[in-house]
Amino acid sequence: MNMAESHLNPVERTAAPAGTQEAAHGRPLEPLNAKIEVNNLNFFYNKFHALKNINLSIPEGKVTAFIGPSGCGKSTLLRTFNKMFALYPEQRAEGEIMMDGENLLTTKRDISLLRARIGMVFQKPTPFPMSIYDNIAFGVKMFEKLTRSEMDDRVEWALTKAALWNEVKDKLNQSGYGLSGGQQQRLCIARGIAIRPEVLLLDEPCSALDPISTGRIEELIAELKSDYTVVIVTHNMQQAARCSDFTAYMYLGELIEFGETEKIFIKPVRKETEDYITGRFG
């Protein structure tokens, strides 16, 4: 098996040690199987210290939401997981982001292979300037050699998982630009999962969508966690409460509190968290 295939047919990996995880400032959590472990993470835009000593465990097979005011660092943290910052020499990360025993910040793995394991969907729908079919097939072709029949099956599978197949199955050769905003975002999600990643990152995936499209995306997120570890950044606290199993509240580049979503929203430990959730922030 070559490196490009390894993420598609993963062997059993060593699970993170079981034990009690602690949220910011010592809040106890139940034992978790962490998919991603963030240890002493600091991030800089030139000299600006954007993330400050972040320690966090992302539970496997769950939806984790990052919330906080604009500029708090939640999107920056999300983008460190698949090294989006590597495109910009003035940006740097220090510390550890561990996944399956490997520090993603220092790995020698080809960055395209890393991003195949950790897919990402951005705030604004970004279909490629090609057909709906080719939008899905594009990434798959980078990592697998499939027959046309196999590719047809993969395209149908991904679009079905993204709850889009029934809406586009008769127009696969049409441009992705012809879809509505909500359909385009589901197309981007289908494109992200077509290469079968282990983790799916969603950066404000509903901010540009109408309420009906937002509802469909939220339903999709709930379904995806059965197959993927999902991390979502959102300004919408109600969305975080509806969609996530765990929530991290961030402020000024620091992780203030992390825990089970229900507890964070009903009985947070930190006053800063309570003030933000109840609208008394600032």
Curated annotation (Swiss-Prot):
Listed SMART domains: AAA (SM00382)
A single GO molecular function term of this UniProt record: ATP hydrolysis activity
Catalyzed reaction equations: phosphate(out) + ATP + H2O = ADP + 2 phosphate(in) + H(+)
E.C. numbers: 7.3.2.1
The keyword Flavoprotein belongs to this UniProt entry's keyword annotation: no
Pfam families on file: ABC_tran
Keyword Membrane: yes
Domain ABC transporter: 36-277
Subunit record text: The complex is composed of two ATP-binding proteins (PstB), two transmembrane proteins (PstC and PstA) and a solute-binding protein (PstS).
NCBIfam families: 3a0107s01c2
Descriptive protein name: Phosphate import ATP-binding protein PstB
Organism: Burkholderia lata (strain ATCC 17760 / DSM 23089 / LMG 22485 / NCIMB 9086 / R18194 / 383)
Originating gene: pstB
